[in-house]
Amino acid sequence: MKTIIAVTIFGILTCAYAAEGDDCSIEKAMGDFKPEEFFNGTWYLAHGPGVTSPAVCQKFTTSGSKGFTQIVEIGYNKFESNVKFQCNQVDNKNGEQYSFKCKSSDNTEFEADFTFISVSYDNFALVCRSITFTSQPKEDDYLVLERTKSDTDPDAKEIC
């Protein structure tokens, strides 16, 4: 009987915490993240919200005189309209979360925070991305990025 009660309580707690959704603020970033290697070249979205459609291309470049500042350019193709975003790094919270202020080609502004959980600089990255729009609640999602375009979306290279 004690086992049944314990399993039931565990199941209820599991469902309760799973229902809350993703929360990037509680994620632990990888300790040896090398931003100069990650923020270089092109990344493709392999798994995340909307991965089957639209195609998402992420280009990361570095610039700046002291250290470096990341500039993120994202091509986003949805409903046959191509929207581009440019994000400028504004902060590096606790050395773990990279914060950006972003503006789209259609003048939408938002803030994006990236927590890098696991990265193989030549192949893949597991990232927790938090986006905050001024008039909407914060949205946290886990993304799997890859260096080479997979065959899941043939249009991805065209928008990069």
Curated annotation (Swiss-Prot):
Misc note: The sequence shown is that of clone TR5.
Effect of residue 145 to F: In clones TR12, TR28 and TR45
Places the protein is found: Secreted
The family this protein is said to belong to: Belongs to the calycin superfamily. Triabin family.
Pfam families: Triabin (PF03973)
Functional note: Thrombin inhibitor. Forms a non-covalent complex with thrombin at a molar ratio of 1:1. Inhibits thrombin-induced platelet aggregation. Prolongs thrombin clotting time and activated partial thromboplastin time. It only minimally suppresses the amidolytic activity of thrombin. Inhibits thrombin-mediated fibrin formation in the host. Inhibits thrombin-induced endothelium-dependent relaxant and contractile responses in host blood vessels. Inhibits thrombin-induced mitogenesis in host vascular smooth muscle cells.
Entry annotated with the keyword Signal: yes
Higher taxonomy: Eukaryota, Metazoa, Ecdysozoa, Arthropoda, Hexapoda
Protein name stated in the entry: Triabin
GO cellular component, one term: extracellular region
Organism: Meccus pallidipennis (Triatomine bug)
Swiss-Prot/TrEMBL GO biological process terms: blood vessel diameter maintenance; symbiont-mediated perturbation of host defenses
Signal peptide start and end residues: 1-18
Keywords carried by this UniProt record: Blood coagulation cascade inhibiting toxin, Disulfide bond, Hemostasis impairing toxin, Platelet aggregation inhibiting toxin, Protease inhibitor, Secreted, Serine protease inhibitor, Signal, Toxin, Vasoactive
Tissue expression notes: Expressed in salivary glands.
GO molecular function, one term: serine-type endopeptidase inhibitor activity
Cystine bridges: 24-128, 57-160, 87-102
